[in-house]
Amino acid sequence: MHGLYSLPITLGGEYVDPDNTTRTLVSPPVKDIHDLSVLDLDNVNMEKDTAARNAFDALCYMREEIGEEVNCTMNFTAPFTVASGIVGVEMFLIMLVREPEIASKIMDFVLEAQFKLAEYFLKDGFSVGTSDPIASNSVISPRQYRQFAMPYEIAFAKRISAYTGKPLGIHICGQTRKILKDVADAGFVSFSMDNMVDLAEAKELVGDRMYLLGNVDPVGVMYQKTPEEVSEAVKNCYHKAWDSPMGFAIHNGCDLPAGVPKENILAYMETAKICATDMAKAEPEHIWDY
């Protein structure tokens, strides 16, 4: 993953780099929204963006070691979320109301910058997906999503698809129930949902239009519960969505925090293998029904 705010950091944003988590943006590169001079595509490249370079090296290593078994994919954050890091999240949300033209100008730049970086990975044969955490209805309204976030998700996806000939999947954090149909309308082939979304309801609303992924709670279950409780959570996800018309795969609701017990990860994987085997049989009785 490229990181939510790797581009703002590359453009001069101040950050901290803790030992136990990813880099955290603490001050955006743009201090005055009427001065966007730092938004220069000449400063967007693999040499200056250490996060992109490190991710590329890691993907190359993964492909060499396990590339015959799994697909190695890079995730680039969508323009809406990245733009929020250019000026700061609070200021960006204010701009959606008071300065929408400037907000759009920033997202235009981010669209070009993110695709410029993505091309390095595409040219080397890696798949590219996207995510848009700040586009969550836990942060913005469905109307704002449709007006500001969705058009740039579509634009970025079209750029990638034009290169690969394949549609993209997307992840959006938080509550997304009210925009499920919008995400499907955007043309995404798959949708990774956070644990706030009910998989059974998502299946009924858009299961015939998108491949669904989800959505074991990464903190409340994976980090805080026992292996037995993790196993039950995995089974519950399968129980709700195993027969989704366009397909289903188990997934965490979002990124796992540092320090998740190894036993919980193993319980997740082992239970998922059993459930996926049952799912493939497509028989009326499954392990999650007991």
Where are these regions (language model features)?
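Acidic/polar N-terminal loop/beta-strand segments that form early-domain functional surfaces
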Residues: 1-4, 75
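A short glycine/small-residue-enriched secondary-structure motif
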Residues: 3-4, 26-38
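Glycine-rich loop at the start of a catalytic domain that most often binds anionic cofactors/ligands
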Residues: 3-20
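Active-site loop segments of alpha/beta catalytic cores
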Residues: 15-31, 42-290
